[in-house]
Structures are given as structure tokens and as C-alpha cells.
Amino acid sequence: MSVVPVVDVLQGRAAVDSEVTVRGWVRTRRDSKAGISFVAVYDGSCFDPLQAVVNNTLPNYQDEVLHLTTGCSVEVTGTVVASPGEGQSFEIQATAIKVVGWVDDPDTYPMAAKRHSIEYLREVAHLRPRTNLIGAVARVRHTLAQAIHRFFDENGYFWVSTPLITASDTEGAGEMFRVSTLDLENLPRTDTGAVDFSEDFFGKEAFLTVSGQLNGETYACALSKVYTFGPTFRAENSNTSRHLAEFWMVEPEVAFASLDDVAGLAEKMLKYVFQAVLNERADDMKFFAERVDKDAVDRLQRFVTSDFAQVDYTDAIEILLASGQKFENDVSWGIDLSSEHERYLAEQHFKAPVVVKNYPKDIKAFYMRMNEDGKTVAAMDVLAPGIGEIIGGSQREERLDVLDARLAEMGLNKEDYWWYRDLRRYGTVPHSGFGLGFERLISYVTGVQNVRDVIPFPRTPRNASF
């Protein structure tokens, strides 16, 4: 007798007539008049539960089996048999059921069998992975993460662990969470009355990182091809379906690479990870297509077979102006494209994923390489049909004098970036990279609209429960 996951039984990896034990939780129990109970047991290893057929001859049938409710944890031992019913190929003929844990009060158990609103599930985030929806999201999230690591490993990239605590603002936007051990009731002050951060833990101001990019660049300028994959933080007071205060980012950095090089890398990576989901999570994707977004599977299949379009920002503005569409946000050269503009380009005009390149310098970060026209920078956004921007990237400014001018232009103190500037002083090279918001990627794959529902414990304004 061996302990096996539910997925092994359902996919035929446990031999028919073999005796196995599965451990999991009760999804449902159905009793027949013939004295047989059908207990659906799931363990999270796949979307579908395993049906255990339980005869009333089991010694604990009356006292325990007939009292099993949704959420009870059980250990079922029995024989694998071909299932005569529809919905599953195999089931287990139970020879023993051990109740590991009861649900105290089935009437008040938040994850009872009925379907709950997604808003309610956020209030019970510690229990919501037990639902079909969040369980499927978790497995897809895992598959995407593993595929990302696999893709970069197969293409010669090294994973770099960049710090979560930093003194640098990568975006220069100032929307950062402060890290401090100072006593808020008794803050040390300088002679001018300002908070004296030299008394703080790090001897200076420190923050949670908004991006691993700058640190990633240092390793790209030594290992050539690297990527970071970890949590980032933005103290942006945005209560929208697209924003989180804590989220995960994938950020490759490539030495000796142009903007076009990383645009090609972005296309290759997205197609690779989407194909991995289609191959490895067919059961979960079937659920998303049936219950969440009927286009979920077809959208990924179209994406992996599409050729990416490319367009200059200036030309994209002309396309939008000539479209005849009435946009909520006015279109003119110099604006940051809004979601409606991005989606028009990807869904209506190009009808394919599209890379928009060479944005006005005034709406982009200091580290992006200035183009020869002096007005635009070598930046790109990858726009996907159905969501808009999914990746943002650029060629990095490798010329020290131009970088210093940009820092000054944006009111940033170049001395705060002394180590970043050193990369341009000692063997500088052209290099490029991009950032992919992992939760936005999961939202695109699953069709789950709100990013709060694709991360285990969402952190948003006024919400840091669990």
C-alpha cells in the first residue's frame, strides 16, 4: 500500500487493482439508498477530486462516514478501479476511511459547497485556496513561475537575488514604503528639526524596493545574462483591479543587448510560458474557460501562434488619432498611453500582440537610453490583446554624461546613485532589460480580472490582513 496524490490516480499512474492511500479533504458526500456513499476527495494536486466509493459495511460508516461534510480531512485506503460513471476514468473502492480532522460547525464553515462571490473570498483569504477558483489560480501561478525559471535557465541566464531593502528609488517616483526601527513616539531630530535617519538601523533612509532592476544591471555587467524574480513594493494609493502594494516582478537584464534584442526576448519568453500552461494545466484552464472567461484557452493559443507587431510611439499616436474612436483620455503626442489606447492598438488595429517603442523621454524613467532625436528614449511596452500593457522595458543609458544629465533633469541626486554610475565608468556596455508584472501575467492567463485574486494574500491600501 502506497500513499499517492489524487492526480496519480486520475491520470492512470496508479495501476488498476492496486491498493493505495490518498489524503485530502472532502469536497462533497452523496449517499445512495443502497447503502453506499460517494465521497469526493481533493488534495490540490489537480483540479478534479477523486471519487471514493464507500460501502456501509465499513465499521465506522454509521458513526463517521455519514457525518462527513465539506472540508473534513480524511485518509482513504482502497483499491483503484475503472470508474463506470461519467466524469472520471478511475475511482477508489474504499476499504478504510480515517477521519483526520472534523469541521467544527458545518453550518458556519465559510467554504461550504455553495459558490461564493470573489469579493467574499478575499475576506477569508486563509481559506479561499480550498475553492475551485483559487486552487486553480495557485496551480497556474506555480506552473508560470516554474516555466519562467526554466526558460531563463535553458537560455543561459543566471537568477540573481536582489535586495528587498534599498536606499535607491528605481522609478524616481517616490512611491516607496519606508523601512525604519525609529521610535515613532520619540523621533531623533537634526538641528533643523528634520528626522535624523543617521540614528536609524541602517544609518540612513531605507525603503522597500520598487524594482530589482538597478541591482540586476550590476550583475548583467559581469555575468552577461541575468534575471530577477521576486516581490516588489509600491506605496501607490490606487484601489483598482490592476494595482497591488506588494507584487512580484520578473526582470531580465542583458549585456551587449539592444532594445530590439529584449523585445525579441519578451516575445520568446511569453510564448514559452503560455505554452507550458496549455501543456501542463489543461484541467485548470478548462475550468477557467468554462467558469471565468470563455476565451481563456483560445486567447493563449492565438498568442503563441501570433507574430508580434512593432510600432513606434509616434506612429501609434497617429494610428489612434486616425481611428475615429472616441477615447475617454485625449490622444496627443507626449501622453502616456492609457489602457484603452493600448487595447485599441492590440485588439482593433493590429489584432495581435504589439511592441510600442521609442516613447517621449518626459514620461519615462531616468535610466532609459536617450535616442538621437533628444526627445525620445529607447523604451518599449508589450501590449497584449485583452489586457493592454503586460511588459515594460528599455535599453539602459550606458553613457555616464547622458545619465548624469537625466538624473539632474529629474531632480535626482547623482551621489545617491554613485554605484550605479560606476557601471558606466568601468567598462560600460550597451545593455537592456524589461519588467514583467507577474500578477498581471496570471490575470491575463486565467481571465481572473482582479489581481487581488491571483496572489495568495493581497496587500492593498487599508488592507494588510493575514
Swiss-Prot record:
One protein family per Pfam: tRNA-synt_2
Keyword Nucleotide-binding recorded: yes
GO MF, one annotated term: asparagine-tRNA ligase activity
Main location: cytoplasm
Any one GO BP annotation for this protein: asparaginyl-tRNA aminoacylation
Protein name, per record: Asparagine--tRNA ligase
Keyword vocabulary terms for this entry: Aminoacyl-tRNA synthetase, ATP-binding, Cytoplasm, Ligase, Nucleotide-binding, Protein biosynthesis
InterPro entries: Aa-tRNA-synt_II, aa-tRNA-synth_II, aa-tRNA-synth_II/BPL/LPL, Asn-tRNA-ligase, Asp/Asn-tRNA-synth_IIb, NA-bd_OB-fold, NA-bd_OB_tRNA
Enzyme class, spelled out: ligase
Documented EC number(s): 6.1.1.22
